[in-house]
Amino acid sequence: MPGAGDGVEESCSGGEGAVPGTGSEAGAVAGREPSRLCGYLQKLSGKGPLRGYRSRWFVFDSRRCYLYYFKSPQDALPLGHLDIADACFSYQGRDEAAEPGADPPTHFQVHSAGAVTVLKAPNRELMTYWLQELQQKRWEYCNSLDMMKWDSRTSPTPGDFPKGLVARDTTDIISQHPNPSAEKARTVLAVEAAPGELVGDRAAHQPAPGHPNPINFYSLKQWGNELKNSMSSFRPGRGHSESRRTVFYTNEEWELLDPPPKDLEESLVPEERKKPMPEGSKGVASSGFPFEFGRNPYKGKRPLKDIIGSYKNRHSSSDPLLEGTATSSGSSGGPTKPVPEMQLQIQSQQEELEQLKKDLSSQKELIRLLQQTVRSSQYDKYFTNPQISQGVPGDTLELLHQKDEQILGLSGQLERFGLEKESLQQEVRTLKSKVGELNERLGMLMETIQAKDEVIIKLSACEGSVSSPTLGPSSPLAIPASKDQLELDRLKDSLQGYKSQNKFLNKEILELSALRRNAERRERDLMAKYSSLEAKLCQVESKYLILLQEMKTPVCSEEQGPARDVIAQLLEDALQVESQEQPEQAFVKPHLVSEFDIYGFRTVPDDDEEEKLVAKVRALDLKTLYLTDNQEVSTGVKWENYFASTMNREMACSPELKNLIRAGIPHEHRSKVWKWCVDRHTRKFKDSMEPDYFQTLLQKALEKQNPASKQIELDLLRTLPNNKHYSSPTSEGIQKLRSVLLAFSWRNPDIGYCQGLNRLVAVALLYLDQEDAFWCLVTIVEVFMPRDYYTKTLLGSQVDQRVFRDLLSEKLPRLHTHFEQYKVDYTLITFNWFLVVFVDSVVSDILFKIWDSFLYEGPKVIFRFALALFKYKEEEILKLQDSMSIFKYLRYFTRTILDARKLISISFGDLNPFPLRQIRNRRAYHLEKVRLELTELEAIREDFLRERDTSPDKGELVSDEEEDT
């Protein structure tokens, strides 16, 4: 029967459709982790007339000291970022021309990467809070560069420190603490500022504080798409055409201020009515639509600025009628339409009224012209009629014809004069109304002058009592005093603003000076380190040249010669490792290979000199491979980009994440990704348990005696003796290992404890906390591995060995035939690979890359890497021609494999296809066979015990004296 772990990889196969963590889970995570520095700010962007403030969601990333900004909290990809580590900050003081009591400016500048970014906070307090927090983050990040002891395998960014036992090595302090005087000065110059509701994760659930603007903001691309869609709806059969698409490309952060489609259509209709209908559209006037977009020559010629301008005119508030309507509607108590809708309706009615007036005047002019034409045609008809012109002389007819033309001309002139008279009368009426207004203003001015004359008379009468202090505040003499008071208040406000600005700038200068000194000290240390490395290289090169020179000289075999002394000196120098006796020289002292690697494993054993030399060579080869890989586009950059895309969302299964994990998780991110993998697989268990479930098990293990506790104590020091975290009984790792194993023995009494579980927990504790390591063990035993994998019979482990034998015969037939030919049982070696997931079988770098993929994809990864190890050394194994040498080589060949990239390429590339269904079917097939064999063995054992118990001669021992007697 397949185990619980068979469907693990299927849960991640559909990564693109995976759903991120639920809201409750996200809330729980947010409750455990410290609050992030995030919130809404307005960023000045754009060019030309479109330049303005746009509301953006800002999130600070402590790993790289970047301030990312998004369009909204729901966006996955950031629009850009600001490098805070190399930035300096400033802000403008209060404007001198501002009135007293006016709000101070709330925008500040971030100078970074040769550019100035202007950000604006909703109020002054939030601006101060953002500036202080960004200063603090910059200070902590730059100081952490000095406080960290960097290994070449760690990232240069000090964020996301590991949380397990390796975290103790990561945070070793090798330099002095920051300058106490600088810290004290920073504290004194700090300004009290509390975060508001627009800062923190809770701000993501609130609407973005926008800039008041009558025009709705839409992006250029969205506006173009809406226009295209609205046009295609009027053109049947061409709505889905892909050949008529207009796309705007830009590398700037541009946004177009444009109206919604509905308002745009309303603004377009009056504009189209003003234009005469072309001849080609007369036949379409009676159809359902008054015009067609595809054939209207005026539609495409209308510039974009006319559309936006018409919309701005419609929304302008200069019309007094609009203001009056808005005021009346706002003051009425009954249910009315919203003010914008009523304004739009009144505006459209006014435009329609103006259009009707223009149409009426044009119709009148047309009627007048038609009347003149009718008269002229009647006169022409009258004179051309032969019956009327009979008997009349030609001269008389010519004279009459001229008189008629004069009459027509005079009639037209009379009509024109009539029109001019009407216009002049209208102008006279307008001038009369203006004269009336001017008379009213003149009356008001006369009244004002009269009032001033009265004041002057009163002042003249009270000339003797000018110095009297009984003047009230309403007296004209109090006006200069009030102006002085206003000026004094304005100066006080400016003084207060300059004080706060001066305090901030002093703090900024102090911090930048301290950070510059730290950077200079780091540069000096690095220069000293590189000089020491260069000197050491010259020494080694000199010794090699001496050695080569001596090798040319023939030396008697009995004599020692200087060459042997040089070789001995070179070997002695090569076997030296880094010591922790003088940590203050750690920056200057060159160390290529440390005594322990970043995981805590010993790099050079304490055995004979030959073994130490081989281990040193292997460690140097590992470091060379790592440095060579880092010279290319490293996976660390891809991981940073991935985490940048998850600033506003939870991690989820995806092909991108699977490929990143297969290539290996960087050391600084491994704790985070491992914890996420464990939480994803154990979510169903945790949801049904109490929050303090692990602590309850741990308390039970301490209070009650467990049958497995004795075996656990025996195996603690034998777990990873070559790792410094588990080397002594007082090590922190030993205490945590004991707690996790005891807690699991109480959770799963069917297994209790099995040898091999201790190594699984020990590896997990290197990157996970105690409780997370417990759930990691639950994931491996109860989710990944089949049932009875770690029980007394090891049924699942035996089944997997037979499945692996079948896969080896299929994927590597030559090697399988070679093993069968010399009767080599390689499962004696591979059994431990599967039981403890390659712990103590491969070098540490490869081990943790295997565990990365194992915790994400499940147990199928073990089959992949086991086959890849054999394929990696297939040619070397085929050269061995006897069973003893083959078996001896199999016992240590995995420790000689150092190239993790090549091994991963074989595992996930050369061995494909590798379907999970095949492993399931093979497991089910071999499970029945192994069960039958175990049943037969159990029956044989019971028969043997029964015969032994029923035998009369129980084989009692007899002494020599009894035999003699």
Curated annotation (Swiss-Prot):
Q: What is its main location?
A: other
One family from Pfam that matches here is RabGAP-TBC
Protein keywords: Coiled coil, Endosome, GTPase activation, Phosphoprotein
**Single biological process term from Gene Ontology:** endocytosis
Q: Where is this region: Disordered?
A: 1-27, 257-288, 310-340
Q: List the disulfide bonds.
A: none
Q: Where is the Rab-GAP TBC domain?
A: 664-858
**Phosphoprotein recorded as keyword:** yes
Q: Which GO terms describe its cellular component?
A: cytosol; early endosome
* TM spans (from-to): none
Q: Which InterPro entries match?
A: PH-like_dom_sf, PH_domain, Rab-GAP-TBC_dom, Rab-GAP_TBC_sf, Rab_GAP_TBC_domain
Record flagged with keyword Phosphoprotein: yes
- Positions in coiled-coil regions: 339-537
Q: Residues where Phosphoserine occurs?
A: S155, S317, S475, S959
**Any one GO molecular-function label of the UniProt entry:** GTPase activator activity
Q: What does this protein do?
A: GTPase-activating protein that plays a role in the early steps of endocytosis.
Q: What is this protein called?
A: TBC1 domain family member 2B
